């Protein structure tokens, strides 16, 4: 039921985003819909489909972050996408590590600039996930 609801929401958000591509909030909402669909698919055991949804979310967030690099929320959203991909076992370890490092670096940069909200300081979570990965060869 949740997946069907998220897909219905995605269809609406896709329509809105197409109507006004300059509306960054609608673009962000679209990325959130893809992420939520990925979350449900992952729980259902469909890693490859979750990966596809997470990649779509990442693509939207990369576009927003490029469009307005000074927007801390877009950067945090991008870090979240990196975390989702970095913790998805459907990816090879090297790719997971690269996503986790990228996301952690994004958060560190925002924090160093004094723009990371304490509630969004997930650098420790990135470090914990990196520590779980097998050592790089």
State what each model feature region is.
Residues 1-4, 8-12, 73:
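Long, intrinsically disordered low-complexity tandem-repeat regions enriched in serine/threonine/proline
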Residues 101-137:
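Terminal, low-structured helical/coil segments at or just beyond the last alpha-helical repeat
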Residues 25-43, 73-87, 121-131:
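Conserved alpha-helical positions within TPR/SEL1-like repeat arrays
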Residues 9-12, 33, 57, 81:
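Ser/Thr/Pro-rich low-complexity tandem-repeat tracts
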Residues 14-27, 62-75, 109-118:
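Flexible helix-coil transition and linker loops at the boundaries of alpha-helical arrays
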């Amino acid at each position: 039921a949740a997946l069907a609801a998220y897909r219905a929401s995605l269809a609406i958000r896709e329509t809105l985003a197409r109507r006004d591509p300059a509306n960054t909030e609608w673009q962000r909402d679209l990325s959130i819909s893809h992420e939520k669909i990925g979350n449900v698919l992952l729980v259902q055991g469909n890693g490859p489909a979750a990966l596809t949804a997470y990649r779509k979310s990442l693509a939207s967030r990369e576009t927003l972050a490029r469009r307005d690099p000074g927007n801390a929320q877009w950067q945090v959203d991008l870090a979240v996408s990196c975390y989702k991909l970095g913790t998805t076992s459907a990816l090879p370890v090297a790719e997971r590590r690269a996503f986790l490092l990228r996301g952690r670096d994004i958060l560190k940069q925002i924090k160093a600039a004094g723009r990371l909200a304490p509630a969004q300081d997930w650098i420790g979570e990135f470090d914990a996930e990196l520590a779980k990965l097998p050592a790089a060869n």
